From Swiss-Prot:
GO terms for cellular component: extracellular region. Its main location: secreted. SMART domains: SCP. This is Venom allergen 5. Belongs to the CRISP family. Venom allergen 5-like subfamily. Disulfide bonds join 25-37, 29-125, 49-117, 193-210. It comes from Polistes dominula. The keyword Cell division does not apply.
């Protein structure tokens, strides 16, 4: 009887797990199949990671905290009108800049994609039932240490030097400013990130993918409401 119940429990848990994965298959994107539908929920590095000596999968609890803190530090700097850089600068103050909070579902989807080792490539569909989801990717390496998550996020922040608030996002400038504009998109509320740290060709690489809900970077829309 105990064995039968144990088997039943395993079957039920398996069905629940499969149904969760199948839910993502119901989420449709015009650009393609959802990441979790295509690859499942495993965050184990895929065969595409061959040749990379994986040291860690996913951000630590401390790194999660730092990711949220760095996003909000920079968002509030911009919101208060203290960001002097730009093309031209300074950036105007904002009246609708939310403080971001961590979202585990966004992080899970980001980690599934990061673990495919499709380096610096965006996945085709990462939405949730709640959100259209935006994405930023960063990659940096050093010969003697893994670059910090803060350093990676600052790569996105530094794109502000090329941004003109009055022009906004265009097809022409998106490649230069799109990470910055997603970082400070006023209506975005939540962030969740996946990461890999690995050694390749004697370099210590830190690869970071952050998903944002709701997404930003809509052409023709201001990145935030100017105060």
């Amino acid at each position: 009887m105990k064995i039968s119940c144990l088997i039943c429990l395993v079957i039920v848990l398996t069905i629940i797990h499969l149904s969760q994965a199948n839910d993502y298959c119901k989420i449709k994107c015009s650009s393609g199949v959802h990441t979790v539908c295509q690859y499942g929920e495993s965050t184990k590095p895929s065969k595409n990671c061959a040749g990379k000596l994986i040291k860690s999968v996913g951000p630590t609890e401390e790194e999660k905290k730092l990711i949220v803190e760095e996003h909000n530090r920079f968002r509030q700097k911009v919101a208060k009108g203290l960001e002097t850089r730009g093309n031209p600068g300074p950036q105007p103050a904002a009246s609708n800049m939310n403080n971001l909070v961590w979202n585990d579902e966004l992080a899970k989807i980001a980690q599934v994609w990061a673990s495919q080792c499709q380096i610096l490539v965006h996945d085709k569909c990462r939405n949730t039932e709640k959100y259209q989801v935006g994405q930023n990717i960063a990659y940096a390496g050093s010969s003697n240490h893994f670059p910090s998550v803060t350093k990676l996020i600052q790569l996105w922040e530094n794109e502000v030097k090329d941004f003109n608030y009055n022009t906004g996002i265009t097809n022409k400038n998106f490649g230069k400013v799109g990470h910055y504009t997603q970082m400070v998109w006023g209506n975005t509320k939540e962030v969740g990130c996946g990461s890999l740290k690995y050694v390749e060709k004697n370099m210590q690489i830190h690869y970071l993918i952050c998903n944002y809900g709701p997404a930003g970077n809509y052409l023709g829309q201001p990145i935030y409401t100017k105060k």
